[in-house]
């Protein structure tokens, strides 16, 4: 990797990625030289203008991998965040000096560096344990067993692969191979659907598992393991499949193989193959991989049980649950958006489920449902509900850092293809390939598009992200997420100037010290708390809090200078909805979707008719604000830029003037105020 790294530095390519850290494999000199040669060719052409046709067959595999990687990391912050996670996952191994000069060195020195052959070429444990008579030295104890590295894993379900052509299957297999190279082991569960009897489904599942295995094996430096006896059914719990052997499941994953599993379980009392639902297989595998499948003895010490579970959880980290369904992500039937880009389960699960159920039961839905008595035709909304519920059930068993992705095999396959060079193109600028949602999410832990982007911005970015004919992204990123608190609750009481709440920041329902800490951490400045309370307490419109004060927004009703707050309708009509503070803890910035969660709540639930705010002209966050606002205005003779989401604001000169005067007149409340603008 040193060769590749030096190649990047020599060419002065701003690629945002430290490949020395990203490619977490130990390479021998020949492989490293091969990478250097291929990557020099890649960089000499320019990362965004090369295509598969530019490379020899020997170069293509490596160039494909790096091109996909370069394209999927869109910002330095995202790349650095991934590198930090990768570094934490794989701490440097302690170097130990050899204690003997000839006993084992003569065997291991001839092996390629980075190849772990276990005990194949070394002495077995029985040899070490055997008594040995030595003449020249004191007997050495057997070598201590080093703890295994934590396995980072993605659990993937592919629905009805029998309906997908070979091009799509090969594209999915290519992506799985790339994920594996990036340090994410993959376990694939085949879902044959429900169209057929048990025997037919079992046959289809086995055939498709073998088909996917063959496609994976066809990828360069990739190997699959088709496991057909992973799950079992106990007579005591016939409805709950369990993993028959944890070791048999994890060993091929640790060896870098992509495991493929059919939803077939074997009964324990009388060996018999039973077809189970793919969802049950996913839940059983999740429970095992999360360390929750152990059934302790009722008489066992609880502390000992906890220690055993903790040990299992240190072995494996189930980071991603990926559902590949031809229908794609979860659709949205409210608002301008057509699909949910990001779902915060803690906040949105019930609402989205009820929305899908409502549409399913409506006359419009029944009118479009296929008829004709075919009992095997599935309702698309039923499948979306199924994907939503499965994501909820799985993430409930996993740490909050784990996430889910619901997308289509077609989108994954399309983004895995290299755009072909067009002979008629004379421009030096090539078509940028579509970002792969799975690789992008691995690098960034975020969806392809921000969920707080307005619909017009999403469409524009989709057009820019792919080729001219690329369809809009329909991938849903799912997190267990965090609860969201809105005070007062806009579902109970709409936020309007006429019914302003009698609310203050020192209200018992608000943890003021944590709120102050959130603001000071986000802005990196000390707040003059009393001065701030004096300014906003009589003007509060409400408060939004994400999680345990990981993010939040303070919103007020402001009057332009010279307008008296006398409670009259004329005075209330002039009140401006104002975002006074928008804060996210530093540790939650750039990942986790905290800012999107708070912003969405503000513009969709609290102030759907519009809100305004201001920001320093040189604030690096302004790009984020620009993308989410309806309009902006640089305030002359100040260092402020005004933003708003209010439709048609510029058409109402009086309203626009009120917004501008409010943004000009607000005084900051910082304890370290030195006259520099906020």
Curated annotation (Swiss-Prot):
GO terms for molecular function: L-glutamate N-acetyltransferase activity. The keyword Transferase applies. Pathway: Amino-acid biosynthesis; L-arginine biosynthesis; N(2)-acetyl-L-ornithine from L-glutamate: step 1/4. Its EC number is 2.3.1.1. GO terms for biological process: L-arginine biosynthetic process; ornithine biosynthetic process. Coiled coil: none annotated. InterPro entries: GlcNAc_Synth_fun, Vertebrate-like_GNAT_dom. The keyword Transit peptide applies. It is found in: Mitochondrion. Residues 499-668 form the N-acetyltransferase domain. One of its GO terms (cellular component) is mitochondrial matrix. Keywords: Acyltransferase, Amino-acid biosynthesis, Mitochondrion, Transferase, Transit peptide. It holds the Pfam family NAT. It catalyses: L-glutamate + acetyl-CoA = N-acetyl-L-glutamate + CoA + H(+). Residues 96-111 have a biased composition (Polar residues). Residues 86-111 are annotated as: Disordered. Belongs to the acetyltransferase family. PANTHER family: AMINO-ACID ACETYLTRANSFERASE, MITOCHONDRIAL, N-ACETYLGLUTAMATE SYNTHASE. N-acetylglutamate synthase involved in arginine biosynthesis. This is Amino-acid acetyltransferase, mitochondrial. The gene is arg2.
């Amino acid at each position: 990797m040193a060769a590749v790294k030096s190649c990047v530095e020599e060419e002065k390519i701003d690629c945002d990625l430290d490949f020395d850290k990203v490619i977490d494999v130990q390479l021998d000199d020949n492989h490293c030289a091969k990478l250097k040669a291929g990557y020099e060719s890649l960089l000499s052409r320019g990362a965004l203008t090369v295509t598969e046709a530019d490379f020899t067959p020997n170069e293509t595999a490596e160039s494909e991998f790096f091109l996909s990687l370069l394209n999927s990391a869109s910002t330095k912050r995202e790349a650095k965040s991934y590198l930090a996670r990768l570094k934490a996952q794989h701490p440097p191994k302690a170097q130990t000096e050899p204690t003997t000069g000839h006993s084992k060195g003569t065997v291991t020195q001839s092996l390629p560096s980075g190849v772990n052959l276990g005990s194949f070429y070394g002495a077995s444990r029985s040899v070490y344990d055997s008594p040995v008579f030595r003449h020249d030295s004191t007997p050495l104890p057997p070598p201590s067993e080093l703890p295994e590295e934590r396995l980072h894993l993605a659990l993937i379900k592919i629905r009805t692969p029998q309906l997908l052509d070979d091009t799509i299957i090969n594209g999915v297999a290519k992506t799985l191979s790339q994920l594996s190279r990036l340090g994410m082991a993959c376990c694939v569960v085949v879902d044959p659907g429900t169209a057929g009897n048990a025997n037919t489904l079992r046959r289809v599942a086995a055939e498709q598992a073998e088909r996917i295995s063959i496609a994976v094996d066809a990828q360069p430096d990739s190997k699959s393991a088709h496991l057909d006896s992973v799950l079992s059914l106990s007579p005591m719990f016939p409805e709950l499949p369990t993993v028959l052997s944890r070791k048999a499941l994890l060993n091929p994953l640790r060896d870098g193989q992509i495991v493929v599993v059919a939803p077939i379980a074997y009964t324990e009392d009388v060996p018999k193959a039973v077809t189970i639902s793919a969802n049950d297989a996913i839940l059983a595998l999740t429970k095992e991989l999360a360390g929750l499948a152990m059934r302790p003895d009722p008489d066992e010490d609880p502390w000992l049980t906890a220690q055993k579970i903790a040990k299992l959880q240190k072995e494996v980290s189930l980071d991603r649950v990926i559902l590949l369904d031809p229908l794609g992500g979860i659709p949205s039937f409210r608002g301008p958006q057509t699909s949910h880009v990001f779902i915060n389960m803690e906040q949105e699960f019930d609402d989205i489920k009820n929305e899908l159920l409502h549409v399913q039961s409506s006359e419009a839905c029944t009118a479009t449902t296929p008829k004709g008595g075919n009992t095997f035709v599935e309702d698309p909304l039923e499948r979306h509900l199924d994907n939503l519920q499965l994501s909820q059930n799985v993430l409930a068993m996993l740490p909050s850092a784990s996430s889910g992705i619901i997308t289509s095999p077609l989108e994954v396959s399309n983004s895995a293809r290299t755009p072909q060079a067009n002979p008629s193109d004379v421009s030096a600028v090539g078509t940028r390939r579509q970002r792969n949602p799975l690789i992008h999410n691995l690098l960034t832990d975020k969806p392809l598009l921000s969920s707080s982007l307005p619909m017009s911005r999403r469409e524009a970015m989709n057009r820019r992200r792919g080729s001219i004919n690329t369809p809009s992204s329909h991938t849903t990123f799912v997190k267990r997420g965090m609860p969201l608190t809105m005070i007062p609750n806009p579902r109970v009481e709409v936020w309007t100037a006429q019914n302003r709440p009698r609310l203050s920041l020192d209200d018992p329902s608000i943890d003021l010290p944590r709120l102050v800490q959130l603001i000071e951490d986000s802005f990196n400045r000390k707040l003059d708390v009393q001065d701030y309370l004096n300014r906003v307490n009589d003007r509060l419109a409400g408060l939004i809090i994400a999680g345990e004060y990981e993010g939040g927004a303070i919103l007020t009703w402001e009057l332009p200078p010279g307008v008296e707050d006398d409670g009259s309708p004329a005075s209330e009509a002039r009140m401006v909805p104002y975002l006074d503070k928008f804060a996210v803890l530093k540790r939650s910035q750039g990942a986790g979707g905290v800012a999107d969660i708070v912003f969405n709540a503000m513009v969709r639930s609290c102030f759907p008719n519009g809100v305004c705010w201001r920001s320093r002209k040189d604030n690096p966050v302004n790009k984020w604000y620009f993308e989410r606002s309806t309009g902006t205005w640089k305030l002359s003779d100040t260092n402020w830029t005004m933003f708003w989401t209010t439709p048609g604001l510029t058409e109402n000169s009086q309203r626009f003037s009120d917004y501008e005067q409010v943004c000009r007149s607000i005084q900051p409340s910082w304890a370290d105020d030195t006259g520099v603008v906020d």
